[in-house]
């Protein structure tokens, strides 16, 4: 049996809050330290779980900071700081990692899916010479603008899904946000746009009303007067993306014996699986289990590859 902690991070996302508004102004490094402090406090109050193997996990942007959080925890363990968290490893899914990989492989991925033509792909290779992050000439900039325009026509999070309304309310102003910190009311401020039932975002739409329901909040133990309205994505949070790459943290952790599970959906163009495979190869690990199919119920379910440090 496994126990799972679902954490709203960074502070001021989800149902988390800060007594001082400055506490919401964080970035990759500071938010990761916040998570470490939370875990230290949680294990201090629940010492019966300290002996359990502990794994961190996160998808998408959370996948970028998970190795950093794991590094902070491992450093605390090496210094024998209490509580001693029994960290064994981490898992990340479709993780944002490094723009040199994540952005560059969008072009190759779009070509593989047939979203851009051979001619556009060849023009991109010729004029950008493999650098699709910051165009170095006008011809490269123009072809990348064409690529981005074509990708914008689809749901790049899953290229087989229809493009739907993103079920997130419009950003609220600072005055309204401050008012939320003082109110006990859970009356929704502004419902998100309603997608059609066949859209994958319809679940996000329903979640907005479910999470703002009083029975749900009571069941979750949400403290009254803290967060008046739950919003799935708070785009207006003052978050600084100050860690350029998480690759050094992946390398450091795995070389020190921590286990890592990196998984990636093959229809994601926001973080293409090609980019994930590329940065993993850059770690120069030896392959211990060749690329193969694994089966579930007699059907090929996926094609995993296992690696280990040299």
Where are the regions that the model predicts?
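Terminal and linker regions of secretory-pathway proteins
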Residues: 1-310
């Amino acid at each position: 049996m496994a126990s799972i902690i679902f954490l709203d991070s960074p502070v001021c996302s989800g149902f988390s809050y800060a007594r001082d508004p400055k506490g919401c102004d964080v970035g990759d490094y500071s938010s990761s330290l916040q998570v470490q402090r939370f875990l230290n406090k949680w294990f201090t109050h629940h010492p019966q779980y300290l002996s359990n193997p502990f794994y961190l996990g996160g998808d998408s942007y959370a996948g970028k900071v998970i190795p950093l959080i794991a590094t902070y925890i491992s450093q605390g363990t090496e210094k024998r700081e209490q509580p001693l968290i029994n960290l064994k490893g981490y898992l990340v899914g479709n993780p944002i990692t490094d723009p040199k990989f994540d952005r560059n492989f969008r072009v190759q991925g779009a070509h593989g899916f047939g979203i851009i033509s051979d001619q556009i792909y060849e023009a991109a290779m010729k004029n950008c010479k493999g650098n699709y992050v910051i165009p170095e000439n006008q011809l490269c900039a123009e072809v990348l603008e064409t690529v981005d325009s074509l990708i914008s026509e689809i749901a790049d999070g899953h290229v087989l899904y229809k493009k739907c309304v993103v079920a997130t309310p419009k950003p609220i102003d600072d005055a309204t946000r401050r008012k939320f910190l003082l109110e006990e009311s859970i009356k929704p401020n502004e419902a998100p746009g309603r997608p059609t039932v066949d859209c994958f975002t319809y679940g996000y739409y329903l979640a907005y009303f479910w999470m703002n329901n009083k029975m749900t909040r009571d069941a979750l133990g949400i403290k009254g007067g803290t967060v008046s309205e739950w919003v799935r994505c708070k785009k207006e949070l003052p978050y600084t993306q100050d860690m350029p790459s998480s690759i050094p943290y992946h390398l450091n952790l795995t070389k020190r014996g921590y286990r890592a599970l990196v998984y990636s959906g093959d229809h994601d163009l926001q973080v293409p699986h090609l980019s994930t495979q590329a940065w993993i190869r850059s770690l120069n690990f030896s392959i211990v289990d060749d690329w193969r199919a694994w089966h579930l119920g007699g059907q090929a379910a996926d094609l995993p590859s296992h690696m280990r440090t040299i």
